[in-house]
Amino acid sequence: SDQHAAGAAAVAHLIARGHRDIAFITGSLDSPTGLERLSGYKSALAQQGIAVNEALIVEGKWNAQSGVAAVDALLAGGQPFSAIVAGNDEMAIGAMKRLAERGVAV
């Protein structure tokens, strides 16, 4: 699907730039869109032989506040990551805002 392809393309782009520990802020996993984008994320990692780290997957709710909360959860989780893919622009904006507030270069 287009949603699967979108998730995969974002991850493939980051892998091509050298990232291996890629976090993913999903959309709501009770929605087909959220599930398809997550599937694309996992497929792109698998195609490059990179194991999925479930600790780097955080469910969001399609809004900026859930992007903020997801970054807090990722940082609290203690698993290193060098990039984040968000399921939509609103969550990405929230994530970027929180990373900047926490002193993480974006």
Language model features: what each stretch is:
Residues 1-106:
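Bacterial carbohydrate/catabolite-sensing allosteric modules
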